[in-house]
């Protein structure tokens, strides 16, 4: 599975320049805690400064650039025998080509239980981080249609999708639930 060709630049940008504001998102911020049961095992993909740490008992934060992560690796390189009930992909699966995005989704899906769910916050291709370095980032142009197509491709259904705003930007929020075949 290919890594982003500018992974080193992305790691530097997200460890030194970017700052998150998870608390201000209406759906994909701390409101997600309402979807978590105490027994749920959760992986936070691209967890940044690991804001859910201490709020979710069985959480593993994976991030290639932030030292507050439980595991400092790109998701493509993360290996474990553990399976997770829920994956958070909150602004992390936003960079690169269709091939890179598809590979990252395949990896995340492989880490989930048969009843797994994925919560998404996706950037619809906007370079709105309010700094010049952001112009060098290759944002994937997410749409609700792409989220629906990928959900279907990987055996999930979309159970919620809406715009999610904070004081700085507008993002796509989406929840996937695995489809059971009988």
Per-segment meaning from a language model:
Residues 102-114:
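A short glycine-rich, Lys/Arg-flanked "PGG" loop and its adjoining helix->strand segment in the class I
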Residues 88:
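A conserved beta-strand element that flanks and buttresses the S-adenosyl-L-methionine
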Residues 82:
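Active-site charged/polar residues at nucleotide-handling catalytic sites that mediate phosphoryl
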Residues 91-95:
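Short catalytic micro-motifs in class I SAM-dependent methyltransferases
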Residues 99-103, 171:
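Generic recognition of short, well-ordered alpha-helical segments
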Residues 37, 96-98, 112-114:
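Helix-to-beta-strand junctions that scaffold the AdoMet/dcAdoMet cofactor pocket
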